[in-house]
């Protein structure tokens, strides 16, 4: 496993079978490994945790906090295609997601009232 800090709240986590990108909004991404699925997480819509440019990445799935709404207006502003929107999952409450075979994302209860996938 390799973890790269990408400024403020951003991290790139490279596991043998998948790459995870968390809250990237600033700085350059290192070269992504070809052929390895990418999951992109944005915990919430604050500009220091989310930028619409994530949707230009060739990600297997985008896991978004519940305040990142894929309304028709936002989709138009962000240039989001139907194909990309179909790969977006909104996390909130206690739902689990299985964006890839063998990968399960399960929100855990927060320890504070700060922003979260909850």
Placement of each model-derived feature along the sequence:
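Short, conserved acidic/polar surface loops in the N-terminal third of protein domains
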Residues: 52-53, 74-75, 116-118
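Short, aromatic/basic amphipathic alpha-helical patches
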Residues: 71-87
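Short hydrophobic/aromatic-enriched beta-strand-loop microsegments
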Residues: 61-65, 83-92
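Active-site metal-binding motif and surrounding structural segment of the metallo-beta-lactamase
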Residues: 26-71
């Amino acid at each position: 496993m390799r973890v790269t800090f990408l400024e403020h709240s951003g991290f790139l986590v490279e596991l043998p079978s998948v790459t995870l990108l968390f809250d990237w909004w600033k700085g350059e991404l290192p070269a992504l490994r070809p052929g390895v699925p990418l999951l992109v997480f944005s915990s919430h819509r604050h500009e220091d945790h989310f930028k619409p440019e994530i949707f230009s990445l060739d990600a297997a799935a985008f896991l978004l906090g519940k305040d990142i709404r894929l309304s028709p207006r936002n989709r138009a502003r962000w240039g989001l295609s139907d194909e990309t929107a179909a790969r977006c999952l909104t996390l909130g409450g206690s739902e689990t997601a299985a964006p890839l075979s063998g990968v399960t994302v399960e929100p855990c209860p927060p320890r504070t009232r700060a922003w979260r996938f909850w």
